Amino acid sequence: AINVLKIRGSHGLVGNDAIGGPRFLFMSTIRTQGQSYYFGDDQELLAGMEENAIGNTDVTWEKARKSNIGIDLGLFNSRVTLQADVFKEQRRDILLQRGTVASVAGFFPWSIPFANLGKVTNKGVDGLLEIKNTTSKGLFYSFRGNFTYAKNTVLENDEPAKRFSYLSGKGLALGQTLAFVADGFYQSAEEIAMSPKTFSTV
């Protein structure tokens, strides 16, 4: 018999101002000791002025829209209890330094502005199941287990177009490592000669 039944839910929008990056992102700055050039007959080396950082007055904090639905269930006078939650979080306006600005556009790498460009989604389920009882002789026992599944996906990271789709970080987990998968080791010279061409020498 069910003696506890509770359904929970929440939905909200929160901000995150701990977004990292340098201070005063809204300000453009000029560096007086910039690129150097030779001038005059004696070819004196003089430092020029250059754009040190390009400000962005539209920079704001990161935002997260979070939704959660959960259930608390107790059976047989709470001898069996279950807690389960399904959650989804959509983060947007993640602060990134632009990755699609080409160097031929006249920007130094350190002067490329920051902007709220990133989008990431997190979703998953987690739960807790507990079974407990006291025997007729006064022995108490309990078993508890939990489970969690979570998936993180990058929706937008302002990365430049990749030559091959597998090089893109979009659609993958945040910070996921990209690497080659090895099929094994060569065992003989004959095996090397019979194998397809690889990306490097052996």
Regions found by a protein language model. Give the residues of each.
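Alpha-helix N-cap recognition
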Residues: 188-189, 201
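Extracellular/periplasmic, surface-exposed regions of secreted and cell-surface proteins
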Residues: 1-181
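Short, intrinsically disordered, charge-balanced linker/junction segments flanking boundaries
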Residues: 1, 196-202
